[in-house]
Amino acid sequence: MKENDVVLRTVTKLVVFILLTFGFYVFFAGHNNPGGGFIGGLIFSSAFILMFLAFNVEEVLESLPIDFRILMIIGALVSSITAIIPMFFGKPFLSQYETTWILPILGQIHVSTITLFELGILFSVVGVIVTVMLSLSGGRS
């Protein structure tokens, strides 16, 4: 990448912000609508890959406090633990718990363990895709 790609770098900063924001929306909307951890993970991964393309891979990896291989493992553990825990309470594998909390400022909030499961999926997808892309590009995996 040339050092004077000002337009690419400027547009990348804006597009990465939009991708991360849309990724959060898709992740949280996925409980009731299409989306969730897998699609959100793909969107987050595309934001990271765009940063790697526009900027130096080593600079981006040094500025991000994320080890994508560990993120992949954490995601698999979170999803697995969320799926297994109901079995200790006599419920089937992957049973989900749902409740509603009433918070002073936010009002009524719907809370479900599916969100933790989907977060594990998101972490795994981001970890796998970014690790594979870094390995294929010859960058640090």
From Swiss-Prot:
Pfam family membership, one: MnhB
Keywords, alphabetical: Antiport, Cell membrane, Ion transport, Membrane, Transmembrane, Transmembrane helix, Transport
TM region(s), chain numbering: 10-30, 35-55, 70-90, 114-134
Gene Ontology terms: biological process: monoatomic ion transport
Molecular functions per Gene Ontology: antiporter activity
Taxonomic superkingdom: Bacteria
Record InterPro entries: CPA3_antiporter_subunitB, MnhB
Signal peptide start and end residues: none
Gene Ontology CC annotation, any one: plasma membrane
PANTHER family assigned: NA(+)/H(+) ANTIPORTER SUBUNIT B (PTHR33932), NA(+)_H(+) ANTIPORTER SUBUNIT B (PTHR33932:SF4)
Quaternary organization: May form a heterooligomeric complex that consists of seven subunits: mnhA2, mnhB2, mnhC2, mnhD2, mnhE2, mnhF2 and mnhG2.
Protein role: Expression of the mnh2 operon in E.coli is not able to catalyze Na(+)Li(+)/H(+) antiport. It does however confer higher growth rates than the control strain at up to pH 9.5. The operon may encode an NADH-ubiquinone oxidoreductase.
Protein name: Putative antiporter subunit mnhB2
Organism for this UniProt entry: Staphylococcus aureus
Gene: mnhB2
